[in-house]
UniProtKB/Swiss-Prot annotation:
<keyword id="KW-1003">Cell membrane</keyword>
<protein>
    <recommendedName>
        <fullName>Putative membrane protein insertion efficiency factor</fullName>
    </recommendedName>
</protein>
<comment type="function">
    <text>Could be involved in insertion of integral membrane proteins into the membrane.</text>
</comment>
<keyword id="KW-0997">Cell inner membrane</keyword>
<dbReference type="InterPro" id="IPR002696">
    <property type="entry name" value="Membr_insert_effic_factor_YidD"/>
</dbReference>
<comment type="similarity">
    <text>Belongs to the UPF0161 family.</text>
</comment>
<keyword id="KW-0472">Membrane</keyword>
<dbReference type="Pfam" id="PF01809">
    <property type="entry name" value="YidD"/>
</dbReference>
<dbReference type="GO" id="GO:0005886">
    <property type="term" value="C:plasma membrane"/>
</dbReference>
């Protein structure tokens, strides 16, 4: 239930705000898509943990690149 809510909120962000902000993520998949995949694969709590770890790497001093959900 919580996982579905989180995925729904992320998808809402992807459909509404993300197009206005433009492509900024230095990773593939994007951080929001990574969050969706992590939550769907690992559940709400563990997926959120993986997402927080990923977001902590999303800054100008990190090279980025391909970073799939474990």
């Amino acid at each position: 239930m919580l996982a579905r809510l989180l995925v729904g909120l992320i998808k809402l962000y992807q459909w509404t705000l993300s197009p206005l902000l433009g492509q900024r993520c230095r990773f593939y998949p994007t951080c929001s898509q990574y969050a969706v995949e992590a939550i769907q694969k690992h559940g709400a709590w563990r997926g959120a943990f993986f997402t927080i770890c990923r977001l902590s790497k999303c800054h100008p001093w990190h090279d980025g690149g391909h970073d799939p959900v474990p």
